[in-house]
Each structure stands twice: as structure tokens, then as C-alpha cells.
Amino acid sequence: SYYPGCTLKTQAKELDASARRAAEALGSTLDELENWQCCGGVYPTSRDELATKLSSVRALAAAEKNGGILVTLCSACHNVIKQTNDLMINDPEKAQRVNNYLGPDDAYGGGTKVMHYLEVLRDEITFDAVAERVTAPLNGKKIAAYYGCLLLRPGKVMQMDDPENPRIMEDFISSLGAD
């Protein structure tokens, strides 16, 4: 299941469209999760910490029923949903309390793997396959990777790459032919 998030539906529509076209060119699809809601990243001032997790848990539960993989593209959504998933898996008391909000038919059992689109490209499709399908290589272009503060940290939860010496973006950029 693909979780686009609010930003990709408003201010970053081009990124969403590009990711979808790239997935199709690579023989895959980004099947959008139905009836998704904001990940909850905008709710940090809520007095009820667990209520801030409900949107993410609803997405995790829907993905669990739909194959067990949730793909994100927005770094903020990825961070919020992945940290929520970690909480639901590793804190049974809080997980139960969150699931009580949702009800028995919508409870989340912890069976969703959250992946950033870059992880899908690296681990499922492979960067070699990406390189083989590039139609307009970026040869001679120097592109700097920017990870920001949300994609890799906290490292024990995100587990996407080495937070001190990441390579995933550089390897992706190389697969496109750039330096």
C-alpha cells in the first residue's frame, strides 16, 4: 500500500506523479491506500499522546490487511509512521490503549513493514534495475544528497541506512548516472 501523505497531494504533486511514473517504468505500481488520513505529524501539541497516533495506526492497520507493506515517500510521514509502528510493536500497553480507540474490527496487530520509496528501489527493485531502465542518464551532473533530520533518525527505529554514514541516496543518484 502506498501512503502519499498530505504534502504529496498539495505542495509536492510533482514528486508524487514522478514516483508513480518511475514505479510503472520499473514494472511496479504504487497502489494508494484508500481513505488515508494525515500521518499525525501536525498533531504534536495534542494533550493526549495516544490520540496523535491514531491516523498513523489506521494506515498501518489498513496496510496490514492489504499485504503488510506500507510505502511512504514523504520523510516526515515516514518518520511519524515508522516511529508509531515501533511503539505499537514494542509497547503492548500503549498498543492496547490505541487499539481500544479503534475498536476490534480495526485493531492493528503489528504486522506492517513500513518502507520508504528509496528502500523499495534499493531492496525490492534494486538500484541495478533502476540503472538499466534510465532513459536519460544524468552523466556528468554532480548532485548532492540531502537526508534532512527525519529520514534516518532515530537510527534504531528507522533502520534505513547508517545514520552516521548513509549511502542510500548517493547509490540512487549513481544509478541515475550522476556523480
Residue ranges and their predicted role:
Residues 1-179:
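Iron-sulfur cluster-binding electron-transfer modules in prokaryotic oxidoreductases
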